[in-house]
Amino acid sequence: MKRSRFTEEQIIGILREQEAGVATAEVCRRHGVSSATFYKWKAKFGGLDVSEARRLKALEDENARLKRMLADAMLDNVALKDLLGKKW
């Protein structure tokens, strides 16, 4: 997954600019982001403050780590079942 060049704090700041009355197109042009990216950020971070955004990011990272651990454990389980299933 491509890493964002904006931190959560920067994204929330950009969203707040638009909420303060600056046109969406102007905010996007000023920061060099597409309107699609802006609205994706608004759907994800709209209404969050910086600490909530950090918590969301931490939870997403933990979720991804746990999914990788589960996949590894499932592969190990399949390998062990195959090994034990063979007759000696």
Swiss-Prot record:
Keyword Zinc-finger attached: no
Keyword Signal among UniProt keywords: no
Cleavable signal peptide: none
Key words of the record: Transposable element
An annotated GO BP: DNA transposition
InterPro entries in the record: Homeodomain-like_sf (IPR009057), Transposase_8 (IPR002514), Transposase_8_domain (IPR052546)
Database matches in SUPFAM superfamilies: Homeodomain-like
GO molecular function: DNA binding; transposase activity
Family: Belongs to the transposase 8 family.
Protein name per the record: Insertion element ISR1 uncharacterized 10 kDa protein A3
Lineage of the species this protein comes from: Bacteria, Pseudomonadati, Pseudomonadota, Alphaproteobacteria, Hyphomicrobiales
